Curated annotation (Swiss-Prot):
Natural source organism: Bradyrhizobium sp. (strain ORS 278)
CC cofactor note: Binds 1 FMN per subunit.
Full protein name: FMN-dependent NADH:quinone oxidoreductase
Hydrolase as UniProt keyword: no
HAMAP family reported for this sequence: Azoreductase_type1
Record field: catalytic activity: 2 a quinone + NADH + H(+) = 2 a 1,4-benzosemiquinone + NAD(+); N,N-dimethyl-1,4-phenylenediamine + anthranilate + 2 NAD(+) = 2-(4-dimethylaminophenyl)diazenylbenzoate + 2 NADH + 2 H(+)
Essential cofactor(s): FMN
Keywords, in A-Z order: Flavoprotein, FMN, NAD, Oxidoreductase
Enzyme class: oxidoreductase
Length: 214
């Protein structure tokens, strides 16, 4: 049975292209694998607070020296890390806000990127501690030209950041499904959604088969 962790970051529910395509991804996965376990963490309906000074102190305090106050400050981080550890597949859905990710997603990231929990450092090299997982990232941008050799590609700080971050944690198998020009005319929007939806259906069909035991 596959465990899929879905993270939604769009401030919008109605009219959100990233949420819509993530819905399609999940429904497609369940159509192929009805017994899959889907865990949803909506960072807008249930916002993750930004880390505090105590949270950071707790991250770098040896377990034997953790005070009750520090354990409380890192309890949410423990919970979020447990969720991603249990997951076989990670599905991130996020819009591009001002060329980068929403602050809600960054807050979640700051809770799950944690030394000796999701990455290690031996004094010379970093190593990710979450290997063997797949990640799919659905992104939405109002304008076009952010992907490939597009004129706005240098301004795309969503894909390269998330690609590096997930790899840093040991998740090397990352697939992006971007939809662009979501503020264009209706025909262009429909074409863009159809193309992204078709890609998702193809990805899901192949991914579910790969997840199943031989």
């Amino acid at each position: 049975m596959t465990r899929l962790l879905r993270i939604d970051a769009s401030a919008r529910h109605t009219g959100s292209f990233s949420r819509d395509l993530a819905d399609l991804f999940v429904s497609g996965w369940l159509a192929h694998e009805p017994q899959a376990e889907i865990v949803v963490r909506d960072l807008v309906d249930a916002p993750v607070p930004h880390i505090s000074e105590l949270t950071i102190q707790g991250y770098y305090t040896p377990p034997a020296q953790m005070t009750p106050q520090l354990r409380t400050a890192t309890a949410l981080s423990d919970q979020l890390i447990a969720e991603i550890r249990r997951a076989d597949v990670l599905l991130l859905s996020t819009p591009m806000y001002n060329f980068s990710i929403p602050s809600a997603l960054k807050a979640w990231i700051d809770h799950i990127v944690r030394i000796n929990e999701t990455f290690s450092f031996d004094g010379a090299r970093f190593a990710g501690l979450l290997p063997g997982k797949r990640a799919y990232v659905v992104t939405a941008a109002g304008a076009g030209g952010y992907t490939g050799d597009g004129p706005l590609a240098p301004a795309n700080f969503v894909q390269p950041y998330l690609q590096f971050l997930l790899g840093f944690l040991g998740i090397a198998d990352v697939t992006f499904v971007p939809i662009e020009q979501t503020t264009a005319d209706a025909a262009a929007v429909a074409d863009g959604r159809a193309a992204a939806a078709s890609r998702i259906r193809t990805l899901v069909a192949g991914a579910v088969g790969a997840q199943q035991p031989a």
